[in-house]
Regions:
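Flexible active-site lid/hinge loop adjacent to a nucleotide/diphosphate
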Residues: 2-101
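A conserved, hydrophobic alpha-helical segment in the catalytic core
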Residues: 6-16, 107-122, 149-180
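Short, basic, glycine/proline-bearing loop/turn elements
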Residues: 18-24, 196-200, 229-235
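Short active-site oxyanion
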Residues: 42-47, 198, 253-260
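Cys/His-rich short segments
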Residues: 73-137, 148, 254
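Glycine/charged-rich beta-loop-alpha catalytic/anionic-binding loops adjacent to active sites
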Residues: 139-147, 192-197
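Active-site beta-alpha connecting loops in nucleotide-dependent enzymes
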Residues: 185, 203-277
Length: 278
């Protein structure tokens, strides 16, 4: 809302709405209000929304901007029960509890409201045939995408990029080549070696992100050591209460020889693991 008075974007991508560093950003409703104000300031701006996220979809429907959706219309994981914290548990239109035909993680999935009929929209960019073995691979609108990334959430990231590029008229014949040349940012699925030992470094600052990092660990059945470093510097977020919303229970099945905690708030992390008998 501070930037939009100076220029009007042609496109906006809404990826998801998760709680993140509450001491800095506040609750999701504050973020949604800011985004809604921004969208009203650029009424001709085209919005590409993650249709699997009920909050992002509601935000698009509640404004008058032209919009389209991307998402993953088929079930990838078979888990029925989860301890994950879901945002948007209740319909933003009528207040009824949301139901799911299936979900992917957090509140992302094939949702619908039994009260007013609000549901996941049709997907203009639909990721299908998702394969998470040896990197990630999937199809979108007949185009096969293969990338040497880990983490199911990266399917959403790549779908968003593909959809935005398509809407903007960018040629896509070299899309896979561009993905292959991209180097992940520091802490984002970063791979390196220390004395011949392979290391993967992942950053997380909210429950949804940490749960996805744990999911990535769980896809590797080989023996491993896990190190969890928690800080509370201003750039990290000083409130670490969100650790109690992460599903650390799953790490008991991670085939880990050791789990080490460190950082300024290592004792908070140690206590959190104690409560799941780790």
């Amino acid at each position: 809302v501070r930037v939009f008075p100076h220029f009007k974007p042609d496109y906006m991508v809404l990826t998801n709405l998760f709680r993140d560093q509450l001491d800095r950003y506040g609750e999701i409703d504050i973020t949604m209000n800011l985004l809604s104000r921004a969208m009203k300031m650029a009424p001709d701006m085209k919005v590409l929304v993650n249709g699997d996220d009920s909050l992002s979809t509601y935000l698009a429907m509640d404004n008058e901007n032209p919009w389209s959706a991307y998402g993953i219309s088929t079930q990838v994981f078979q888990e029925e029960n989860t301890k994950e914290i879901r945002e948007g548990r209740f319909c933003k239109r009528c207040g009824e509890k949301m139901e799911y035909n299936f979900y992917h993680y957090s509140q992302l999935g094939d949702y619908y409201c039994p009260g007013c009929g609000f549901k996941r929209p049709s997907l203009e960019f639909d990721g299908t045939n998702v394969d998470l073995n040896d990197g990630i691979a999937f199809d979108v609108n007949g185009f096969h995408i293969k990338a040497n990334y880990r983490g199911f959430y990266n399917v959403y990231n790549i779908l968003a990029v593909y959809g935005a590029a398509s809407l903007a008229g960018v040629p896509l014949e070299h899309f896979n080549e561009i993905l292959g040349n991209y180097k992940p940012q520091f802490g984002r699925n970063e791979l390196f070696q220390i004395s011949g030992t392979k290391v993967m470094l992942n950053l997380a600052k909210n429950p949804a992100g940490f749960n996805q990092n744990i999911a990535a660990v769980m896809t590797d059945s080989s023996p491993k050591d896990i190190i969890i470093l928690i800080n509370d510097n201003s750039q990290d977020g000083t409130d670490v209460s969100w650790l109690w919303d992460v599903d650390f229970d799953r790490l008991k099945d991670a085939n880990a020889a050791s789990i080490t905690v460190c950082g300024l708030r290592c004792q908070d992390m140690r206590l959190r693991l104690k409560y799941v008998d780790i």
